[in-house]
Regions:
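Short Lys/Arg-rich basic patches
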Residues: 1-50, 82-150, 154-161
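Short, charged, intrinsically disordered terminal tails
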Residues: 176-180
């Protein structure tokens, strides 16, 4: 799944990933010093990895699951209809105001159930504002909007909860960390 996170979040995740790799290398060296062969140490590291050094996407997924469990997002949502699923498959970003955030694109292979939960939550939280944006014809590429139309579009866009916004909130409210 492709998401847009802040450049600060992207930098933090890059540092976390670097720390994870360094800890793995240090542990491998310690295991070799303790008498294991290089291959034995590598096998031990591979077995330790899920618990001690999970993949970055697993760490981000953990933060995301916590955010989706928060009271404001955790609801018994109706499943997405085939038409809604089709609309979610269309490429492009959700409309949003130009708030000056510097964003970085990241791709994560989240579990299918988490992607479905994220997309359903995003759609259900946003459907009223999305409907109004489309009814007023305030979205679409190449639109020439008046100042008033831009103002209305930006107001409605603030009510949207696109998947990337939820991921950014997850990373802010539940900062990723390696297991202790």
């Amino acid at each position: 799944m492709t998401v847009w996170i802040t450049t600060a979040q992207a930098s933090g995740l890059t540092l976390l990933d670097k720390r994870r790799r360094l800890e793995e290398q240090e542990t491998k060296a310690q295991l070799i010093r303790s008498g294991l062969t290089s291959n034995e140490a590598r096998i031990r590291i591979i077995r330790m990895r899920p618990e001690h050094w999970p993949a970055l996407e697993d760490i981000v997924a953990s933060s995301l699951r916590r955010r989706l469990a928060d009271e404001d997002l955790a609801r018994d949502w109706d499943p997405l209809t085939p038409d809604e699923l089709d609309r979610l498959m269309l490429s492009g970003r959700w409309p949003g105001p130009n708030n000056g955030l510097r964003l970085a694109q990241r791709n994560y292979a989240f579990p299918v159930d988490l992607v479905r939960q994220l997309r359903t939550t995003a759609w259900r939280m946003s459907e009223r504002a999305l409907t109004e944006l489309h009814e007023r014809r305030l979205v679409g590429s190449g639109k020439k909007l008046t100042e008033e139309q831009r103002r209305v579009r930006d107001e409605l866009a603030l009510q949207l909860y696109p998947p990337a916004r939820i991921v950014r909130q997850a990373l802010t409210e539940y900062p990723p960390a390696l297991p202790e």
